[in-house]
């Protein structure tokens, strides 16, 4: 896999206000690096749909990233709006990615079905919502790590099969 640029977004209103310490973002940065991506930025945004959607669009359209990973905001709480923001930003869903992540979580928690994370593409960028805690990030990441290089290689090709590096 040629170099893949990635952005990691931690989604948490409290962390965006400077309350507490982000443990999930660094765990997701480490995952991205393990799968061969170069993380160009890790930012924190509050649980606000328009802000999340705007950052997803920015990193896909102008930030030069082939991979955007989010952590947080995927549960059932009223302020968990990451899936809605992601659906608004993507062109196509990649449901198998989110399904594999949920299936992996099933082995570790009886609350796996409460995750609403989605994955999809915007142009040539893959966007994936991860859960909001380090152990779940590890479990979900292990479920999809082997498929990410192929997915990213497919997105890098044009209709004639040529790479866009």
For each of these PLM feature ranges, what is it?
Residues 1-165:
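Non-catalytic beta/alpha edge segments that cap or flank active sites
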């Amino acid at each position: 896999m040629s170099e893949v640029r990635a952005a990691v977004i931690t989604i948490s209103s409290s962390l965006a206000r400077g309350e507490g310490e982000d443990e999930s973002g660094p765990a997701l940065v480490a995952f991205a690096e393990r799968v061969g991506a170069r993380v160009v930025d890790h930012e924190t945004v509050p649980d606000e749909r328009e802000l999340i959607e705007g950052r997803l669009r920015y990193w896909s359209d102008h930030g030069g990233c082939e991979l955007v990973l989010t952590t947080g905001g995927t549960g059932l709480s009223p302020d968990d709006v990451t899936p809605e923001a992601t659906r608004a930003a993507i062109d196509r869903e990649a449901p198998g990615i989110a399904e594999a992540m949920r299936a992996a979580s099933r082995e570790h928690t009886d609350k796996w079905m409460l995750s609403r994370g989605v994955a999809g593409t915007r142009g040539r960028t893959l966007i994936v919502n991860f859960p909001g805690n380090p152990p779940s990030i590890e479990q979900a990441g292990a479920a999809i790590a082997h498929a990410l290089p192929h997915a990213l290689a497919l997105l890098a090709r044009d209709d004639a099969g040529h790479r866009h590096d």
